[in-house]
Amino acid sequence: MVRRDRLRRMREWWVQVGLLAVPLLAAYLHIPPPQLSPALHSWKTSGKFFTYKGLRIFYQDSVGVVGSPEIVVLLHGFPTSSYDWYKIWEGLTLRFHRVIALDFLGFGFSDKPRPHQYSIFEQASIVESLLRHLGLQNRRINLLSHDYGDIVAQELLYRYKQNRSGRLTIKSLCLSNGGIFPETHRPLLLQKLLKDGGVLSPILTRLMNFFVFSRGLTPVFGPYTRPTESELWDMWAGIRNNDGNLVIDSLLQYINQRKKFRRRWVGALASVTIPIHFIYGPLDPINPYPEFLELYRKTLPRSTVSILDDHISHYPQLEDPMGFLNAYMGFINSF
């Protein structure tokens, strides 16, 4: 009898917990995205949108040096956006006539359709479509990329090498801290869980919040160059815009694509004759030193490399904008 009463009370207790948990969970899952900071709001309002196959793609296009024919297109990393380039933007306008950046599909202020099979091939096609939209499809383009953007740049380079219809005419390529080699890439634990999580992935993406995001991203910055809380909120606001946290698992399929198409993408880097450079933050836990750099130099002996200070990590353009900009300008002025 006593045991039966105890079981009944336990059942009642769990029912009460459930009744409390359901509305709390519902409220949590419907937390609105954070408001944009004045700086991020300014970035959005100064940009524009174009349409790719019915989807809105955000981009920035600044006119810089008058009379210069030079154009640079910036390709951002995962999981952030074109806002990653804001610290070097003005410096680039002092050297280039056009400075252009976009938010890839599923990132930043661009549309984030779901369900959707996100792919590096589609992102490369979006870059080509943007340049056609701007009337620059026949101009020689300098590509500057980071992380995820490095893989998109590799596909653009492959199309250029194959002389594909609609391809960009690439003048130069500068990569930075991207996992261009699957064998030296060390994804974060959360990335591993999300890309292979199956039925678990949709649950994890819905439970992701600022605390989880910031604790996951901060370690990929150097110890002296970590973002402030307000900077992390800007990154998180870009992700939460258009419910972007719900497509992170789909976007992460690029890791599997990179393994599948390694020969195509690494081969494109190794076989072209345009100037190629790599800017490297050596403390990067995702592309660790010296394994990554040794393989890079072995695979691409013609490429030049700039190694930043020892404490610079995975986001060199944010951690050391002046060092990054100087390294890039040194490369651009070398040919």
Swiss-Prot record:
Positions of short motif RVIALD: 98-103
Gene Ontology molecular function terms on file: hydrolase activity
Location of the protein in the cell: Endoplasmic reticulum membrane
Cellular component aspect of the GO annotation: endoplasmic reticulum; endoplasmic reticulum membrane
Chief location of this protein within or outside the cell: endoplasmic reticulum
Gene Ontology BP terms: regulation of lipid storage; response to retinoic acid
Positions of the AB hydrolase-1 domain: 71-310
PANTHER family (UniProt xref): HYDROLASE, PUTATIVE (AFU_ORTHOLOGUE AFUA_2G14860)-RELATED (PTHR43798:SF33), MONOACYLGLYCEROL LIPASE (PTHR43798)
Family: Belongs to the AB hydrolase superfamily.
Record's protein name: Mesoderm-specific transcript homolog protein
Gene coding for it: Mest
